[in-house]
Amino acid sequence: MIQRRRPSSGLWKIVVWDEPFFQGKRHEFTTDCYSTPERGFSTVRSFRIESGAWVGFEHCGFQGQQFVLERGEYPCWEAWSGSNAYHVDRMSSFRPITCAVHGRSQLLLFEQENFQGRRGELSDDCPSLPALGWGGSAVGSFLVCSGAWVCSQYPGYRGFQYLLESDTHAGEYKHVREWGSHAQTGQVQSIRRVQQ
């Protein structure tokens, strides 16, 4: 089980609805929701992030495809899944991203798992790793020195998303399996800091 700091209320707020376009049953959260069915929602189909950054998951228990959610409105699934080839029309769990400190973020990426091979360092957003000179489309491991980062499968922040946090796994992501339950490949071609 991942140990994580409990956020204090006021810093994070999400308002959810069980139907698209802010219709149906409504509820506000300021902390983790491990399972929407346990909170009286079969699923969440639209939401508004009022404060903080959040990560939503396809399945209960923070499992499945993940989506980084920053301040704004998400009226339907296209708003949060964007250009993903994998259609996810609902969220079944979500939590705040407590370590998102946009101004002081640092990430080390490695060509191979267990922090081996060629190394790169980022402290700013990178819409295209290949354009930056990173050979190939795969990354083997990450060390998050500070902040929270979202890695995307393709350039331009498209495709599957993988959230990397400095306060999870002590910031160490030694293998693709640690990027999330849906991670199947080390294909990462763009990386950006999470906006708080």
Swiss-Prot record:
Report keywords, A-Z: Eye lens protein, Repeat
Taxonomic superkingdom: Eukaryota
Which GO terms of the molecular function aspect are on file?
structural constituent of eye lens
* Keyword Cytoplasm attributed: no
For region N-terminal arm, the annotated ranges are 1-11
Beta/gamma crystallin 'Greek key' domain ranges (all copies): 12-51, 52-98, 105-146, 147-195
Q: Where is this region: Connecting peptide?
A: 99-104
User: Is the keyword Repeat assigned to this protein?
Assistant: yes
Can you supply a Gene Ontology BP term from the record? Answer: visual perception
Q: What does this protein do?
A: Crystallins are the dominant structural components of the vertebrate eye lens.
| Comment on protein domains | Has a two-domain beta-structure, folded into four very similar Greek key motifs.
Q: Which family does it belong to?
A: Belongs to the beta/gamma-crystallin family.
**Subunit and interaction comment:** Homo/heterodimer, or complexes of higher-order. The structure of beta-crystallin oligomers seems to be stabilized through interactions between the N-terminal arms.
PANTHER family, A to Z: BETA-CRYSTALLIN A4 (PTHR11818:SF19), BETA/GAMMA CRYSTALLIN (PTHR11818)
- Protein name in the entry: Beta-crystallin A4
Please name the taxonomic classification of the source: Eukaryota, Metazoa, Chordata, Craniata, Vertebrata
